[in-house]
Amino acid sequence: MINPIAIKLGPLAIRWYSICIVTGLILAVYLTIREAPKKNIKSDDVLDFILIAFPLAIVGARLYYVIFDWDYYLKNPSEIPVIWHGGIAIYGGLLTGALVLFIFSYYRMIKPIDFLDVATPGVMLAQSIGRWGNFVNQEAYGKAVTQLNYLPDFIRKQMYIDGHYRTPTFLYESLWNLLGFIIIMILRRRPNLLKEGEVAFFYLIWYGSGRFVIEGMRTDSLMFASLRVSQWLSVLLVVVGVILIVIRRRNHAIPYYQC
């Protein structure tokens, strides 16, 4: 089993979980700043947004997780702020981040759709990297299986949980997000292919569809009615993404994304 603590300096413990999140954040910021000038967005605007949105997104991701596991946290309220042990939900972070983006864009007089288009690829890459924090923490895994011989030894050993090998759903989602990142980076460079906003809407469809399938393999995620909470949200993302693309394709006044 991999030690979740990567570096220990006296009382300070730096966890792999945190390293994965921060690494993803740094790369996302770099990619966004590099693309932002094409939409007349200043790098200072990107950095200011991150300084506001990132901590709020972490809080939103934690609150989302706590709300849907309220019975446990009602009995263990001291566990609510202990996010370094895991237990943050990406959908909570995304919803919070999107809300902050719309408010921030309004006050900075930036088109929200432009900000979404330049930031989306970085978000996909950050999510791909962040899932490896779940790997180290032995969370976001799937059903028990008899063997995982197709995987490298270090993954196979880490996926041996409670006496069984577990389906590495963290890996599936990480690779799915990485593939989506590569595809959207290629499509975004093709002239007159994507309209403004369709980078972000592609993300809704791609991530939502992949997450719906992968979430069905998990055993540790939150349930609501007959589906997992994340599956309900995944369906919503896909439907919204498809509707928005259809609407924009029918509106010939909407320009194409400028490479």
From Swiss-Prot:
Annotated EC: 2.5.1.145
Pathway given in the UniProt record: Protein modification; lipoprotein biosynthesis (diacylglyceryl transfer)
Keywords in alphabetical order: Cell membrane, Membrane, Transferase, Transmembrane, Transmembrane helix
Transmembrane segments: 9-29, 48-68, 83-103, 114-133, 167-187, 197-217, 227-247
Entry GO terms, CC: plasma membrane
GO molecular function: phosphatidylglycerol-prolipoprotein diacylglyceryl transferase activity
Locations listed in the record: Cell membrane
Presence of the UniProt keyword Transferase in the record: yes
Annotated binding of a 1,2-diacyl-sn-glycero-3-phospho-(1'-sn-glycerol), by residue: R131
UniProt-listed Pfam families: LGT
Membrane topology: Multi-pass membrane protein
Any one GO biological process: lipoprotein biosynthetic process
InterPro entries assigned: Lgt (IPR001640)
Family: Belongs to the Lgt family.
Biological role stated in the UniProt entry: Catalyzes the transfer of the diacylglyceryl group from phosphatidylglycerol to the sulfhydryl group of the N-terminal cysteine of a prolipoprotein, the first step in the formation of mature lipoproteins.
Protein name: Phosphatidylglycerol--prolipoprotein diacylglyceryl transferase
